[in-house]
Amino acid sequence: NERIKEVVERLSSGGVVAIPTETVYGLAAEVTNLQAIQEIFFLKRRPSDNPLIVHVSSLKQLSEISKPLTELELSIINKFWPGPLTLILPRKKKVLDAVTAGLETVAVRMPLHSLCLDLLQRTGPLVAPSANLSGTPSPTKKEHVQNDFGPSFPILDGGACSIGLESTVISCRTSHLSTTRKNVPANSKTPSQSDIIIYRPGAISEKQLSEFGTVEYYSASQAEQDSAGSIPILPSPGLKYRHYAPKARVEWLSSIDRLWAATETSIVLLLDKTQL
């Protein structure tokens, strides 16, 4: 595939390319290229304390960036990879701080998209946060990427994303203690005793994960409390900053009459379905 060869060359020379996955399109760069990673943060207007997700095509690639897996982590990976599930794992020292926002953990997943996997097999691990301006809805086809970054932006077109929703992000119990930033003492908060923590809901549900043990959510209130503290422990994207906010007026409607009066560009939220 000539197009993939072009993308591989661009990435290997330090470029940034939008790539398809089954969830959303991502802005990809080599995981070892600091300048390219910084370019992603600049393009997205993404805060540097918001960690990136690394994409891999195999367990061998995973072993390049993550410490050995626990039995629980391996069982979950065998069940859901490739697929829309990101695991937060203890990182190897060679992983750049720019990727992890200075955390001792790294977020990793294996996408369920043949074109993306083909690319990853040729390039090795890639960082690939959603290919949009931070805070806006994520792109599920190339036109969405072009809306944010222009018609000439390099894109590997893989068609419309089959899922169209970001991956579920989790950590397993033995890794909960590893989410503090480097050179900062652990805070006094008692670590979770659940087997699995869901940091960001997505295509893989709590019910599916409960097959592997007890599951809890990292709540919005806990995220707010942690980010306001002197030791923010926010190991996952989607915990600290606004996400998926459309550029449209929102109208709260209480009757069917007001629905017909709403403009075509509004997002309509009905407070009382019985009035329909």
Task: State what each model feature region is.
Residues 1-276:
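Active-site-adjacent structural elements in enzyme catalytic cores
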